[in-house]
């Protein structure tokens, strides 16, 4: 992810500042936004019980924003509130019915006893006393901020009397922070996909409720349910609309006009995990691409440009082996050769090819060396660095395995999802290559196997660095690709002591993980790969 920050002031010339990441733009204040009392303009309402709050053409702090120009607009249904002489929070009697650059609000109440008054913008869903940054936000078109009012945007100001005029002026200051997501990709597979939502999780609350204190006028904060996560939906639910499927991902570089998505969050220092939900409408596969951002101070009245390269992790097709074979399962018939018909390596679940090793004259055939009751470890280079059976048991039984049903990845030219998070060996207490968790060396005295359940809760943001991810890469049986996206089997370097047909392997699915040798036929085309390739380092 590109990590630069630019700060723009809309009341001054462009300034830039290189810092950690993102782009920050400060919302300009409404320095020329006036409150006019008892207007004498014959075209205006002269009702003595109403005060006119004028939002003029020159103002730049309205409630929606044009990213490129910095212009702001009042939106349909935007009301303001003003605390009057009696200390009552008064709601304007009118609001725009469309997107406008200027609007004249009418507010009931008394505004004669003071030279200043407190002004509030509390969003569109307010009860008149509070506003909440929503945990579910929705944007129906790219580069559009009309949803700010329902997402929890709010602002405050002090209106002060203009000397020599029967008017009040105020500067509206927006209080939340704003994230502007701009995903892009050079992956041609993803170019045919759509962004359907952006899910942001934090190590602390990023959604909150703010209530106007009737005594002090301050906005008192209180927590909301599930305030550590906000989900922004990025599609138009109207059937047949241009954004019905979501926002396009056709851009090779950041483009706010192509898929810019805006989220309102509570200001503060947050460590964020951003999950971009991407859908291939042709195959109906929908999943996530995850980015984790370091702790950063997100300031109020500021927006941050969150550019993200969505180049998903790609896994090769070259690490499937029969147990301890000299060459990989499809050596000479690799999918990259694009052989005709079913000659070469199958790349889709359920497809088969007859060109797999079928006897020990083939270098792709398994090692069939065996002596009853004697430990036998793999001897070929491709198996030298993979975990032995003891280590596999530590991962399965003590690695706190957690299934991730949504993280996207590619292999052999196709998009898949599904995999498991396991603790890195550094964070597994007692981890040993010489003994399993039960204290026994399974290389010399092993049994059939052991299983463990799998959690469906992802590692927390604070702990995610302690885990690595194994994709559900499936396996090959008799030349056919099985269960890719649903399960995976990884060979250990240890053979079964009691049956010449078997070797130990780790296997997992969405509900279970286990290590065993029963049904671990050496002729299976399981994955043989060191776990450091997947981030266990």
Question: How would you describe each model-predicted region?
Answer:
Residues 2-397, 402-405, 409-411, 417, ...:
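Sec-type signal peptide cleavage vicinity
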Residues 406-537:
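C-terminal, surface-exposed recognition/capping segments
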């Amino acid at each position: 992810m590109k990590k630069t920050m630019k700060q723009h002031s809309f009341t001054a010339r462009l300034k830039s500042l290189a810092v950690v990441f993102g782009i920050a733009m400060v919302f300009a204040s409404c320095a020329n936004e006036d409150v006019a009392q008892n207007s004498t303009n014959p075209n205006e309402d002269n009702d003595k019980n109403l005060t006119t709050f004028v939002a003029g053409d020159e103002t730049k702090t309205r409630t929606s924003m044009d990213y490129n120009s910095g212009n702001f607009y009042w939106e349909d249904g935007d009301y303001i509130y003003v605390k009057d002489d009696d200390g009552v929070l008064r709601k304007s009697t009118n609001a725009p019915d469309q997107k406008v650059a200027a609007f004249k609000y009418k507010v009931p109440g008394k505004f004669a006893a003071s030279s200043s008054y407190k002004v509030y913008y509390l969003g569109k869903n307010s009860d008149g006393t509070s506003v909440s940054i929503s945990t579910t936000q929705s944007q129906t078109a790219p580069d559009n901020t009309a949803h700010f009012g329902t997402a929890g945007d709010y602002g405050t100001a002090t209106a002060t009397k203009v000397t020599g005029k029967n008017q009040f002026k105020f500067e509206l200051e927006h209080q939340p922070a704003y994230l502007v997501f701009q995903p892009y990709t050079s992956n041609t597979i993803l170019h045919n996909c759509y962004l359907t939502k952006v899910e942001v999780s934090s190590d602390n609350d990023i959604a909150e409720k703010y209530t106007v204190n009737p005594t002090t006028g301050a906005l008192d904060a209180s927590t909301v349910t599930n305030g550590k996560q906000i989900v922004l939906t990025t599609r138009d639910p109207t059937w047949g609309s241009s954004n019905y499927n979501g926002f396009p991902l056709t851009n090779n570089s950041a483009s706010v006009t192509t898929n810019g998505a805006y989220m309102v969050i509570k200001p503060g220092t947050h460590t964020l995990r951003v999950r971009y939900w991407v859908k291939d409408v042709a195959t109906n596969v929908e999943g996530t691409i995850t980015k984790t951002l370091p702790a950063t101070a997100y300031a109020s009245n500021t927006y941050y440009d969150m550019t993200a390269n969505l180049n998903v992790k790609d896994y090769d097709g070259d690490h499937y082996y029969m147990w301890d074979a000299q060459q990989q399962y499809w050596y000479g018939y690799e999918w990259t050769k694009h052989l005709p018909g079913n000659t070469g390596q199958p790349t889709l679940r359920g497809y088969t090819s007859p060109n797999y090793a079928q006897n020990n004259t083939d270098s792709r055939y398994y090692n069939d060396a065996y002596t009853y009751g004697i430990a036998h470890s793999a001897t070929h280079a491709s198996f030298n660095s993979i975990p032995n059976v003891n280590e596999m048991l530590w991962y399965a039984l003590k690695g706190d395995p957690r299934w991730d049903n949504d993280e996207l990845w590619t292999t052999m030219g196709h998009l898949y999802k599904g995999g498991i998070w396991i603790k890195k060996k550094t964070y597994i207490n007692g981890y040993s290559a010489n003994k399993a968790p039960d204290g026994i060396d399974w290389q010399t005295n092993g049994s059939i196997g052991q299983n463990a359940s799998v959690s469906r809760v992802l590692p927390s943001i604070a702990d995610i660095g302690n885990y690595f991810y194994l994709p559900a890469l499936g396996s090959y049986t008799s030349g056919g690709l099985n269960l890719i996206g649903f399960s995976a089997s990884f060979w250990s370097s240890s053979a079964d002591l009691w049956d010449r047909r078997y070797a130990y392997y780790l296997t997992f699915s969405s509900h279970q993980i286990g290590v065993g040798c029963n049904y671990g036929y050496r002729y299976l085309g399981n994955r043989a790969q060191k776990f450091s390739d997947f981030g266990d380092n």
